[in-house]
């Protein structure tokens, strides 16, 4: 710590021996050693404190740089968000107020009036669709109409016989009114006899409990001893 050489130390020791004497010199040397040790520890602690402060300063600088970079990124993101909001506001302001509203629907768009009843046009459209689905019936009706007109224009056919009339009535009656067999079901009330539950008397229950509480005797094994 101090720039003392061997000659300086010998010179200081001679002066201390002359001033203090041989009796007080060892105690003075121990005191000087303790003081020098305290001084060295103090210098070491001061040096460590300086090193700690330097490290803290470096960490503080790094923290400040990191915070500055984070603030810069935050500002750039905020500017980007502000620009996007401004563009959206410009686009929305460019539209007319009625263009912003969704398309309004009325009951007429669904083919019904205010009370929920379908329009006649919708009913006719439904009937037309049904007639398109079943064209055979319409062709059958037109064929019957043409047949009737042809019969009126042509000569009348001869009257059918009694046998033909009876056969036709039988077929039409069987086709129009099918026979339905009815089955009569009668219900007879019968009393159901419920079995009487089997209940044991209190005396029998007490006897069975006592029998269960009795200690059960166990057979002890018997050892056989052979006689010599």
Swiss-Prot record:
Residues 138-162, 195-228 are annotated as: Disordered. Keywords: Cell inner membrane, Cell membrane, Membrane, Protein transport, Translocation, Transmembrane, Transmembrane helix, Transport. Its main location: membrane. It is a single-pass membrane protein. GO terms for cellular component: TAT protein transport complex. The Tat system comprises two distinct complexes: a TatABC complex, containing multiple copies of TatA, TatB and TatC subunits, and a separate TatA complex, containing only TatA subunits. Substrates initially bind to the TatABC complex, which probably triggers association of the separate TatA complex to form the active translocon. Part of the twin-arginine translocation (Tat) system that transports large folded proteins containing a characteristic twin-arginine motif in their signal peptide across membranes. Together with TatC, TatB is part of a receptor directly interacting with Tat signal peptides. TatB may form an oligomeric binding site that transiently accommodates folded Tat precursor proteins before their translocation. This is Sec-independent protein translocase protein TatB. It comes from Neisseria meningitidis serogroup A / serotype 4A (strain DSM 15465 / Z2491). The lineage of its organism: Bacteria, Pseudomonadati, Pseudomonadota, Betaproteobacteria, Neisseriales. The gene is tatB.
């Amino acid at each position: 710590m101090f720039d003392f050489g061997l000659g300086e130390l010998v010179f200081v020791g001679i002066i201390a021996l002359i001033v203090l004497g041989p009796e007080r010199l060892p105690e003075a040397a121990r005191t000087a050693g303790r003081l020098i040790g305290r001084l060295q520890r103090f210098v070491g602690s001061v040096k460590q404190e300086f090193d700690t402060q330097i490290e803290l300063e470096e960490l503080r600088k790094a923290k400040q740089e990191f915070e500055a970079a984070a603030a810069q990124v935050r500002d750039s993101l905020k500017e980007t968000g502000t620009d996007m909001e401004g563009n959206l506001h410009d686009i929305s302001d460019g539209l007319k107020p009625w263009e912003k509203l969704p398309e309004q629907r009325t009951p007429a768009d669904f083919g019904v009036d205010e009370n929920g009843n379908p329009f006649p046009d919708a009913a006719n459209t439904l009937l037309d669709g049904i007639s398109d689905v079943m064209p055979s019936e319409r062709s059958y009706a037109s064929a019957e109409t043409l047949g009737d007109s042809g019969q009126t224009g042509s000569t009348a056919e001869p009257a059918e016989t009694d046998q033909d009339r009876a056969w036709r009535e039988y077929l039409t009656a069987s086709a129009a009114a099918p026979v339905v067999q009815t089955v009569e079901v009668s219900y007879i009330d019968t009393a159901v006899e419920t079995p009487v539950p089997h209940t044991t008397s209190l005396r029998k229950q007490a006897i069975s409990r006592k029998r269960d509480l009795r200690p059960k005797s166990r057979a002890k094994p018997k050892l056989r001893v052979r006689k010599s």
